[in-house]
Amino acid sequence: MVLETSEGDTKKFLTNNNNSSASRNNNSHNNNNNNHSPKEIPEETGRSSSTSSNSIPNAHRTNAGQHLLGGSPSSACSTSVSGCGMPSEGLHPTAALQLYAAAAQLAPNGVRVPPWGPFLQFGVPGVFGPNGPFLGRPRFDAASAGGHPNSAAAAAAATQMAAVNASNAFANLTGLSAAALRNVSAAQTTAVAAVASTVATIQHRLMIGNRQSLPPAGPPSEGSNEDGGFPGDGDDDSSAAKRRRSRTNFNSWQLEELERAFSASHYPDIFMREALAMRLDLKESRVAVWFQNRRAKVRKREHTKKGPGRPAHNAQPQTCSGEPIPPNELKAKERARRRKKLAKAIDRQARKLQAKGITVDLEALKAEYISQHKANGTFSDSDLEDDGIQIDVVGGTDSDDEGDSDAVSPVRLGGGGGGGGGTGGGGGGGASSSLHCGLDGDGDSSRAGSFIGGGGSLGSPSSVAPPSMLSNGAVQFGKLEPMDGNESEERDRERDSPKPLLFPAKAFHQLNLQSSQQHHGLVVGQGQGSGSGHGHGHQHNHHQHHLHHGSASASAAAAVANLVHQTSPISMRRSNPFSIESLLFNNT
């Protein structure tokens, strides 16, 4: 404390420890009971500074910047201590600088921090002046740290530092020992380190918060203008899930370049697509989609429904070796198909007419059918050219509308059955020994021309009953023709020779029937029409047609040899009129 005597000279007295402790308690009491608002701090500081400088000329100003903390409870202590005139030499300049920096950073938004000059008069203006290297450095923005959650902790540390500096100044004023000053300096240094670490923590967290609040840095997305202003690439999975890509519009130059590239290759690789995208200022994904759409347009135009791993349905047909089928073979197959269609149509028409009881002339029916279809343009003369292929009207290998099987094929042994019911000759005594072989399972006689060994349509020369199945009265279209002895001998010779087989699958039935007919001497000549009459060709003169057993066995052996030749795989395929081997074999 400063005491003035009546003589007017000022003397300093050292008070005892009790007085000093009382002064310290008084200071702490002032710290606890202070309720000043932050807005009053600069005004009080200004008044205290002016009062101390005017009333006590020799008094020294204290570093009041320590106590300029926003809302700190040490503002009253700064006023009372500054009125005592503490010497500036008692406070370390570095500590004062650190405390002012902390106070400037942690000040709230509404508090104006005074400049450096009035508080730091240390006698070294070149270093600590307003334009010095310490004070000229930029400091943190006080507004950015005002609302930070760590500002209260930093304010508490700065308040503790201010209290330490106040006690240090009072100790210097009362003349404390050097050891006490060293202890106070150590505590001051510790507080300064705590404040510095707090400031560093605040700065680090502020930088992290700013980095998180900023938009992500990076180059702008390519082609965002053509995607309707949406950021990011349209192929990104996360962005594609949130939004829909807008339609891409190509200009004429881009379309010309894409068409030129498509004419060179319908399936460009990734490198070619990337080069096109860079040159045309497009995305690679848009180029790939354009090529997909262009290929789909080509397939739609050519009607090629191509699936994965197989050629288009209208591709050029190939053989098993992979080479295309020759044109002449294709033409031969087409002609055979048309002839088969013609024969089936005529046969169907003939059956309809026979069902109505009308006598059918197949040649006239065929000529009428061809003339009608020539007028329509669906038939031509080239379709009638015979390539040496025998056309089976019934369709021996193809399924027809009637359920035929090989089980009923031995029954079809009749001659060329057909129309009216002419009688085949006298006496009905032999009718019991004759076979009704011109009938199908349902009693229809229109298929009687499909006897074994034949192969032509009704009315054709090959549809006449073979000589081994005819008697003296041959039945053809319900009309009987008498035969003389020479013709009978020729028919007998032809009967002994084996006949070529059109369908080898029925060879066993033919062989068995031939041997049984030769042994028993049966001749079947019955043909039944759909009319009321039946044409019975009865057997006459059995002794003229009986054969010796030796000739029967010889003919059977010849038939077996022919059967072995005819049932080989190649011969079977050649005998099929619609097979490739048959077409090639007949063309040569």
From Swiss-Prot:
Instruction: State the disulfide connectivity.
Output: none
List keywords of the entry alphabetically: Developmental protein, Differentiation, DNA-binding, Homeobox, Neurogenesis, Nucleus, Transcription, Transcription regulation
Q: Where is the composition biased (Polar residues)?
A: 56-65
Q: Which CDD domains match?
A: homeodomain
DNA-binding region(s) from the entry: 243-302
Q: Cross-referenced Gene3D superfamilies, in alphabetical order?
A: Homeodomain-like (1.10.10.60)
Q: What is this protein called?
A: Homeobox protein unc-4
Gene this protein is translated from: unc-4
